[in-house]
Amino acid sequence: MARAGNSLISHGRVAENRRARHDYSIEETIEAGLILVGTEVKSLRTGRANIADSYAGPKSGELYLYNAYIPDWTQAVKAFAHEPRQPRKLLVHRREARRLISAINKDGMTLVPLYLYFNDRGFAKVQLGLAKGRKAHDKRQAIKEREWNRDKARVLRDKG
């Protein structure tokens, strides 16, 4: 059991990729499970993870999450320690995996992790976005639209 000073995450977000919605235009979102070892789960429950530079890709017909950083759990024995940036297998249905792999290969799309979280049952999940990369002018256009919507909402709020 955790001590009073520790705050463990039983459900909710652990990590968020804030750059994903800025650098990519997200076409579709997918929820996938993760295969993790015990020390990875314990480390995630303490809220320590980084998915900013990570991506998902195919490997022998299955999907893996690459470059996600889950640090070592400090209380673990070194024999049970895991590699912080090892590829982690994603759990999706076979048909969905085939569809996503074909979208990556044919359409030049990317699978970007948006959130890493624990669901209500306590299972580690990752929300992936099937995305296309944005060019610099697309990013500027998206920023202009966001500011315009913010200004529009402010005017409507102040008048009402």
UniProtKB/Swiss-Prot annotation:
Main location: cytoplasm
InterPro entries: SmpB (IPR023620), SsrA-bd_prot (IPR000037), SsrA-bd_prot_CS (IPR020081)
Molecular functions per Gene Ontology: RNA binding
SUPFAM superfamilies the record matches: Small protein B (SmpB)
GO biological process terms held by the UniProt record: trans-translation
Span of the signal peptide: none
PROSITE patterns attached to this UniProt entry: SSRP
Localization of this protein: Cytoplasm
Top-rank taxon, per record: Bacteria
Cellular component annotations (GO), alphabetically ordered: cytosol
Keywords, comma-separated and alphabetical: Cytoplasm, RNA-binding
Pfam family, one: SmpB
Cited function: Required for rescue of stalled ribosomes mediated by trans-translation. Binds to transfer-messenger RNA (tmRNA), required for stable association of tmRNA with ribosomes. tmRNA and SmpB together mimic tRNA shape, replacing the anticodon stem-loop with SmpB. tmRNA is encoded by the ssrA gene; the 2 termini fold to resemble tRNA(Ala) and it encodes a 'tag peptide', a short internal open reading frame. During trans-translation Ala-aminoacylated tmRNA acts like a tRNA, entering the A-site of stalled ribosomes, displacing the stalled mRNA.
HAMAP family on file: SmpB
Family designation: Belongs to the SmpB family.
Listed NCBIfam families: PRK05422.1, smpB
Protein name listed in UniProt: SsrA-binding protein
Name of the gene encoding the protein in the UniProt record: smpB
